[in-house]
Amino acid sequence: MAEKRNIFLVGPMGAGKSTIGRQLAQQLNMEFFDSDQEIERRTGADVGWVFDVEGEEGFRDREEKVINELTEKQGIVLATGGGSVKSRETRNRLSARGVVVYLETTIEKQLARTQRDKKRPLLQVETPPREVLEALAKERNPLYEEIADVTIRTDEQSAKVVANQIINMLESN
């Protein structure tokens, strides 16, 4: 990869976007950003608090602005929030400004990876987590697929293995 293209990671919560993104950025000597962490940095509050105070719509507005700004940079790896693809504007920007990698995973793996994580506002509800994740998958998976240049399943692989797969796919294209 001679030129430094932007790499944008999309996929559901628990797919490994942040972990794999950090690994990928380190291996490629690129700058790493996580849209949720960037929102937390700018607001001085965690994502759950922003959700509670501003609602999902307020959070998505912030997310859209942050992703717009970050995707204007060059040579970055960006881990997006799982719901960021709900915005057509965000989908268009991701597609136009870099390579979109869809990190795909099963509901079972999502449950295992998120069960103790209290920073998942959409799972902090009365509805059983499996039902929430299934509903989100039905709504969002087609949107991830719509903009993906590359799709990689992350279920039984380490972050380093997935990062290497992404690098190999990018180099062969």
Swiss-Prot record:
Keywords: Amino-acid biosynthesis, Aromatic amino acid biosynthesis, ATP-binding, Cytoplasm, Kinase, Magnesium, Metal-binding, Nucleotide-binding, Transferase. One of its GO terms (cellular component) is cytosol. Its EC number is 2.7.1.71. Its cofactor is Mg(2+). It is an enzyme of class 2 (transferase). ATP binds at G14, A15, G16, K17, S18, T19, R120, Q157. One of its GO terms (biological process) is aromatic amino acid family biosynthetic process. It is found in: Cytoplasm. CDD domains: SK (cd00464). Gene3D superfamilies: P-loop containing nucleotide triphosphate hydrolases. Substrate binds at D36, R60, G82, R140. InterPro entries: P-loop_NTPase, Shikimate/glucono_kinase, Shikimate_kinase/TSH1, Shikimate_kinase_CS. Pathway: Metabolic intermediate biosynthesis; chorismate biosynthesis; chorismate from D-erythrose 4-phosphate and phosphoenolpyruvate: step 5/7. GO terms for molecular function: ATP binding; magnesium ion binding; shikimate kinase activity. Mg(2+) binds at S18. Transmembrane segments: none annotated. It catalyses: shikimate + ATP = 3-phosphoshikimate + ADP + H(+). The keyword Hydrolase does not apply. Monomer. Catalyzes the specific phosphorylation of the 3-hydroxyl group of shikimic acid using ATP as a cosubstrate. This is Shikimate kinase 1. It comes from Pectobacterium atrosepticum (strain SCRI 1043 / ATCC BAA-672) (Erwinia carotovora subsp. atroseptica).
